[in-house]
Amino acid sequence: MHVKKYLLKGLHRLQKGPGYTYKELLVWYCDNTNTHGPKRIICEGPKKKAMWFVLTLLFTSLVCWQWGLFIKTYLNWEVSVSLSIGFKTMDFPAVTICNASPFQYSKVQHLLKDLDELMEAVLGRILGPELSQVNDTRALNLSIWHHTPLVFINEQNPHHPVVLDLFEDNFNGSASNSPAPGRPCSAHRCKVAMRLCSHNGTTCTFRNFSSATQAVTEWYTLQATNIFAQVPNQELVAMGYPAERLILACLFGAEPCNYRNFTPIFHPDYGNCYIFNWGMTEKALPSANPGTEFGLKLILDMGQEDYVPFLTSTAGARLMLHEQRSYPFIKEEGIYAMAGMETSIGVLVDKLQRKGEPYSQCTKNGSDVPIQNLYSNYNTTYSIQACIRSCFQEHMIRECGCGHYLYPLPHKRKYCNNQEFPDWAHCYSALRISLAQRETCIYACKESCNDTQYKMTISMAVWPSEASEDWIFHVLSQERDQSSNITLSRKGIVKLNIYFQEFNYRTIEESAANNIVWLLSNLGGQFGFWMGGSVLCLIEFGEIIIDFVWITIIKLVALAKSVRQKRAQARYEGPPPTVAELVEAHTNFGFQPDLATPGPDVEAYPHEQNPPIPGTPPPNYDSLRLQPLDVIESDSEGDAI
């Protein structure tokens, strides 16, 4: 009962409002606030009132402007970068090594036979019959050529360039199975380009090159991709360089190692690659001390005599240092080690720690990235390189209907080839140079919040020396179980030394440049400096704002009621009926005080012996006041609410 009574009092007080007008509320605020300035507006003379009003308004605007700047700076989510240097025993990085040639030519020659003959013929047409040593009488398999031919573009007239197929006998486009001598255009007068057409031939583009060397290399790689995409992965692995042939000697610190300590992985660009200290099945190996003697020492045989002649023009080893359990993107982030040289690589470690949302768009494990990570089949950690390549493969499958050979495939998808997807090269070329595709992938992919970078200092020396090369190559040859009359040579041997320069590591860490404490301190400092205010002054200002809103709502409600009453009165003409008239109409239907005749109308009741006796009318009150049983107490009793 007491709760109900209290709630009724509270409701009544809400309906009444603060009980002030706008002017009274402003005067009360200026007289009671602790902020400097408003009190002087109501206490001084007219001139000083105007002066203090202008000053108060000016400094209030200045404070609001400063607050806006600080809040905008805070919402920019800026970071500050701190650099710290630590010293501890560190895990040795994972080391991936590959041969520059992905396959042994002796094992893939049967797959590339037609392509190699066609390549020799192409070189003959480019060089001209006087410089070519190719037998031009051989018949060529031009089925590969027709998908993506190379052409001469004669630009002597820039407004009307002439396009000629390398194997056309005339300008009409007829072709023969063997190259015709005496071409009217040669490499020094014409540019070599690659013609890429859609399957129906309605759309063709030309990919130009500044050198014929680049043109034929890109063309051969594209055709080889078509061939290798149709070969099962197990056969491709068998065609690459085995670990026991590639790795001749291994030493980590004071402990010997061999090819069994390396994890094999197939890379489409470099064939069989091998990773030392990947950490997939065992704990990462630590380095006992900095220096060459405590690092990894390798002697590698590149087998340059078995390189694919037109596919690989670089001789040496490709290597990369990376974190444990991370996929090696060795084509983009690796370095070459030259054959016939001893390459020493000193390593320094940088650890990057980025702030997450909302300070940056980094991700901890890639779970919030909307791109399917195609490299997750390797059980590796997330990286932005994996995301970008997965995104490209996703676009490739959506636009071209097949996946590119260089990237992993999603489930139940096929690699592109000329037989099943005749226009894949045209589609791939357009997608490769598409700016929209690159921007989409860069926008969708995120950097990793925690990353480790290995800074390398590289030095090289000739190895072995002339005085020692004879016995070193003979010993290494015998250890490879080769006959004594077949020795290794300087052209195929690489020696590597990989070690920590020092155990000092740098940690580059991002932290919030402006936190909530910084924001509150600056807001309070500006408010206190310009207006002498505090948090309590803000609460006072909030209170008066609430009262203003409260009074406004009450006035709007009262105005709505007044408008509604005026509309209701406009429906009736004349003055409203009195209470006595309303009671007469509802209690005695036979009584008509003003309109009825003085006596009963006998004609109105022809069948009645006696007309009905009129009822006694009620008192003719002009008003009727009803007092409810439960009298609500006066407002003065509820002022304590």
Curated annotation (Swiss-Prot):
Domain of life (superkingdom): Eukaryota
Activity regulation as described: Originally identified and characterized by its inhibition by the diuretic drug amiloride.
Entry's localization field: Apical cell membrane; Cytoplasmic vesicle membrane
Topological domain ranges for the Cytoplasmic compartment: 1-50, 555-641
Main location: membrane
TM regions (residue ranges): 51-71, 534-554
Residue interval(s) of motif PY motif: 617-621
Biased composition (Pro residues): 609-620
Entry function: This is one of the three pore-forming subunits of the heterotrimeric epithelial sodium channel (ENaC), a critical regulator of sodium balance and fluid homeostasis. ENaC operates in epithelial tissues, where it mediates the electrodiffusion of sodium ions from extracellular fluid through the apical membrane of cells, with water following osmotically. It plays a key role in maintaining sodium homeostasis through electrogenic sodium reabsorption in the kidneys. Additionally, ENaC is essential for airway surface liquid homeostasis, which is crucial for proper mucus clearance.
Family listed: Belongs to the amiloride-sensitive sodium channel (TC 1.A.6) family. SCNN1B subfamily.
Subunit composition and interactions: Component of the heterotrimeric epithelial sodium channel (ENaC) composed of an alpha/SCNN1A, a beta/SCNN1B and a gamma/SCNN1G subunit. An additional delta/SCNN1D subunit can replace the alpha/SCNN1A subunit to form an alternative channel with specific properties. Interacts with WWP1 (via WW domains). Interacts with WWP2 (via WW domains); inhibits the channel. Interacts with the full-length immature form of PCSK9 (pro-PCSK9). Interacts (N-glycosylated) with BPIFA1; the interaction is direct and inhibits the proteolytic processing of SCNN1A and SCNN1G and the activation of ENaC.
Protein name: Epithelial sodium channel subunit beta
Organism whose genome encodes this protein: Bos taurus (Bovine)
Gene name, Swiss-Prot/TrEMBL: SCNN1B
